Amino acid sequence: TEEVFTDNLTTYYRSIILAGPSAKGQELAAKVNTGQKLTWDDLNSATWAVMGASSASGYIYPSLWLYNNYGKQISDLANVVQSDSYTTSMSRLAAGQVDVIVGFAHMRAKYAANWMSKFGGTDDCYKQTAVLAVTDQIMDDTICVSKNSDIMSEGFKKAFADACINIGKSEDGLKVLNVLSHIGYQYAESSDYDAERAAQNMLKK
């Protein structure tokens, strides 16, 4: 399935584990595309390109996916190289320098036009790559309040949330939010951030 950009707003994004055109990448893709579950040995036999350890989509959440499925993390993989950008990761994947990369779920949609013209791919990006896994939701920026503050009553929190949401409903408000690259807010539940809590707990181990 090809990823496409839409005008729909969302409160989260995801990360993907993406196999490329190398022999190992295609071997892993073939297993997934025929409904077979990848083993840890399968994944550990590949060369991975990842981002820095503080990157949510380029390291933390793919590592959490590995932890939840295999009890392992990116740091346990035998062959890992760090990229300085997602452009570099995609270039390495297209050139067959690495077998697998990790990053935000719309990587292919963003870089597909450059796959052959700049990155060295020999066929269409979507034909030469395959999604091996999709991570938990990575929540976008959030406005939080303290649980320990005396003034944070349920009524105040509701009024504060309403005020923040209303900012995004006017043109003047959107101009203010543009400084943060935000285009609006939605109500959230504490449970929306369970995956983030799991990620933070994993990082402590």
Identify the role of each PLM range:
Residues 61, 65, 88, 92, ...:
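Extracytoplasmic/secreted proteins, especially bacterial periplasmic and envelope-associated proteins
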Residues 5-6, 23-25, 53-57, 87, ...:
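Solvent-exposed loop/turn segments at secondary-structure junctions
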Residues 47-56, 79, 147-150, 182-187:
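Second-shell loop/turn segments in exported
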Residues 67-68, 92-95, 99-126:
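A ligand-binding cleft/hinge motif common to bilobed small-molecule-binding domains
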Residues 151-205:
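An extracytoplasmic/periplasmic, membrane-proximal ligand-sensing/linker region
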Residues 1-16, 118-161, 180-184:
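Periplasmic-binding protein-like
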Residues 73-91, 137:
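Short helix-initiation/N-cap motifs at beta->coil->alpha
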